[in-house]
Amino acid sequence: MKALVINGPNLNMLGIREPGIYGSDNYDRLVQICKEAGAAQGFDEVEVFQSNHEGSIVDKIQEAYGKVDGIVINPAAYTHTSVAILDALKAVAIPAVEVHISAVETREDFRQVSYARLACFATITGEGLQGYAHALELLKEYLDR
């Protein structure tokens, strides 16, 4: 079983960008958490992808069709703006979990809208990087049904 973890803009700057909100761990640590959590859940492979470009994220979702069993996605800023990412998730119809490091629901008004959420069966917010481990756990439970 294969999982794909997709990270949007600025997540490559973890540990540098607003550590009071996103923590002090860097992106390499996030990748490590995803790989370890995926293995613990019984995934044969966890691919972790990051891009600052909306089209690259859409391309990656489309390329996943027929190749991955589930997606964990943190669209980051594109959460609140990207119908293209929503449409790509709907097009491939791969089970997906939305994850956010911070509790976006307690932040600025513009962060209250999530287009990606409309194509996801669950959303995890405010658990820091461990939210990815939780998302992979939910994904595995969903796939095992």
Which residues does each PLM region occupy?
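Short glycine-rich anion-binding loops that position phosphate/pyrophosphate groups of nucleotides
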Residues: P9-L11, A76-T79, S102-V104
